[in-house]
Amino acid sequence: MTNIRKVHPLAKIINNLLIDLPAPSNISAWWNFGSLLAVCLALQILTGLFLAMHYTSDTTTAFSSVTHICRDVNYGWIIRYMHANGASMFFICLYMHVGRGLYYGSYTLTETWNIGIILLLTVMATAFMGYVLPWGQMSFWGATVITNLLSAIPYIGTNLVEWIWGGFSVDKATLTRFFAFHFILPFVVSALVMVHLLFLHETGSNNPSGISSDSDKIPFHPYYTIKDILGTLLLILILMLLVMFSPDLLGDPDNYIPANPLSTPPHIKPEWYFLFAYAILRSIPNKLGGVLALLLSILILAIIPLLHTSKQRGMMFRPISQCLFWLLAADLLTLTWIGGQPVEHPFITIGQLASILYFTILLVLMPIAGIIENNILKW
């Protein structure tokens, strides 16, 4: 008799996803981040659900309700800090996952890559709206500054911003709708993840060498299930170290001050995982130009497959491209640092140079490096 997991309609789907899936035999730890992202998403949905049971999305009570969760709700503090630091872990895994895709040429699987970009944008939107909910100073002013960027859109900008706010400033209507969106979007993300996997399993996974692994596949279970469990344990270890020992390490102290529309904080900045994009936004002394650069800093990923000039898929055997990739990684760290600094000399100049370098590497240097490497190999 055939095993039930191979014939039952529901078990068959899970079997083809997680058990009998043919996987390349040589995928490294960089391929662990997909499963880690799934773990992060599940964790965020669960902790978020329990937080939503005690949170109130009203300007007069939002801040107090978060305080109430931390002080009075049974293990509320751990749920709150797992959710806040879970977002940081989520973005670390996201950036590693995208970086892996860039390094090993996984963007040649264009459908999977494009759904991935949509996923990235959706998760960023979700995180931004979540940051507004505690209704601290940085929540309020972050929401004001970022939503105000839409006013740079010619002709309809101001109307659009006031439509999103639900009034003439960030207020109760804004908070309520942000809570509604923050609650629903993770489920949209879950649906997109299914589409992401659907497209991935149409072609099969890439591998570090960049060549087809059809002739050498192994079953996902037990080889990669055990590997994913190890990755998950490490992820949870790092998360719990953060939560237990320094839960506010990655947060902003200003968010422990209740939102006050009459007092602007000296340095308005988003969470650390948006600082690179914020630095690019600030590096252009023109509102519309800054907004376009901010959008392009993420949307540039969509044209990466078109800029691929090398005859090899990944960067494993391409030293010039490798150097450029790690220069890009260092540049992103520099931008992240600059985004958290005040707008004054020398940070303005460093930010502008780092922003120019970011776009130059992706749009100019990497395609040129691919051509040079082809010529070196006489291809």
UniProtKB/Swiss-Prot annotation:
GO terms for molecular function: metal ion binding; ubiquinol-cytochrome-c reductase activity. One of its GO terms (biological process) is mitochondrial electron transport, ubiquinol to cytochrome c. The chain crosses the membrane at residues 33-53, 77-98, 113-133, 178-198, 226-246, 288-308, 320-340, 347-367. Its main location: mitochondrion. A ubiquinone binds at H201. One of its GO terms (cellular component) is respiratory chain complex III. Binds 2 heme b groups non-covalently. It is a multi-pass membrane protein. The keyword Isomerase does not apply. Signal peptide: none annotated. Coiled coil: none annotated. Pfam families: Cytochrom_B_C, Cytochrome_B. The keyword NADP does not apply. Heme b b566 binds at H97, H196. It comes from the Eukaryota. Belongs to the cytochrome b family. Component of the ubiquinol-cytochrome c reductase complex (complex III or cytochrome b-c1 complex) that is part of the mitochondrial respiratory chain. The b-c1 complex mediates electron transfer from ubiquinol to cytochrome c. Contributes to the generation of a proton gradient across the mitochondrial membrane that is then used for ATP synthesis. This is Cytochrome b. It comes from Otaria byronia. The lineage of its organism: Eukaryota, Metazoa, Chordata, Craniata, Vertebrata.
